[in-house]
């Protein structure tokens, strides 16, 4: 069971991943939570660079890919040991943020993602969709025009991916309550894996 959570900052994905982890653990599943960028010792160093330093869009993409490649090795090991792996961001983030937001192009980012991940695709992705205005309000960044425009492109990237991969990506309305979103997450997980309740 490999599940990823996607969405722009302020969408509520980190909350939902924690709630799903608790839900699965209560049902006896071994659960591993990881995040991107990061998730490994070297990945966390890369995360620090990405958060603290100005880099070009291409350098940003390559740093994400390097972090992801290291993490995939661990994810494969956990999956082989029967863990449910829950990941806060994965390849769809790069397509949305670098491909659409930074305008590097969807196809090239997808090709590089495939190389970095050895083709490891999540079983299920929850994209928590929230409009940019709401996300910025939640993050306290309402007056950042350049951020707003960038995030509009990112959101569009996510929506394009959701339309292209409806069998994998479940779109959830991020404006609803935490409890309502969690109910939908649980319903979809139970539907796919027939968990004992």
From Swiss-Prot:
Keywords: ATP-binding, Kinase, Nucleotide biosynthesis, Nucleotide-binding, Transferase
PROSITE patterns associated with the record: THYMIDYLATE_KINASE
Function: Phosphorylation of dTMP to form dTDP in both de novo and salvage pathways of dTTP synthesis.
Catalytic activity: dTMP + ATP = dTDP + ADP
This enzyme's EC code(s): 2.7.4.9
Positions of ATP binding: 7-14
Protein's gene: tmk
A family per Pfam: Thymidylate_kin
Listed name of the protein: Thymidylate kinase
């Amino acid at each position: 069971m490999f599940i990823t959570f996607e969405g722009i900052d302020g969408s509520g994905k980190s909350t939902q991943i924690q709630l799903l982890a608790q839900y699965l653990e209560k049902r006896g599943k071994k659960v591993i939570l990881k995040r991107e960028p990061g998730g490994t010792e070297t990945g966390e160093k890369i995360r620090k660079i990405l958060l603290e330093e100005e880099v070009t869009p291409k350098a940003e993409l390559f740093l994400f890919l390097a972090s992801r490649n290291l993490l995939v090795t661990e994810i494969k090991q956990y999956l082989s040991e029967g863990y449910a792996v829950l990941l806060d961001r994965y390849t769809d983030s790069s397509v949305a943020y670098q491909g659409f937001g930074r305008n590097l192009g969807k196809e090239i980012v997808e090709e590089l993602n495939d190389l970095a991940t050895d083709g490891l695709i999540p079983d299920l992705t929850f994209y928590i969709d929230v409009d940019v205005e709401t996300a910025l309000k939640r993050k306290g960044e309402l007056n950042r025009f350049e951020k707003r425009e960038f995030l509009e492109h990112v959101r569009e990237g996510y929506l394009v991916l959701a339309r292209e991969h409806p069998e994998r990506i479940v779109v959830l309305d991020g404006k609803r309550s935490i409890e309502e979103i969690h109910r939908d997450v649980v319903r979809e997980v139970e539907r796919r894996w027939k968990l004992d309740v």
